[in-house]
């Protein structure tokens, strides 16, 4: 199942970091597909949503399990880490992959 976590290239992570402020402007909740920047749409997400912690770009969903890319909100005190649910892995500054077992 590890293959379900998206592989993000250096170029993709740079593109995502560059447009993160656009996504972070949205209020909490689902971000409509019509508002997805090209860098997000290229990941072919199932859904994109905003929380107080940041933006989740869900690329895999099965029942309660979810995986994808996370862009933290720099205004939040949230610190993504590997030891929790969801767990986070750093891809580049300001860009993480995440996995939630539910």
Describe the residue ranges of each PLM region.
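N-terminal export/targeting and maturation segments
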Residues: 4-52
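Short, solvent-exposed recognition patches
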Residues: 37-102
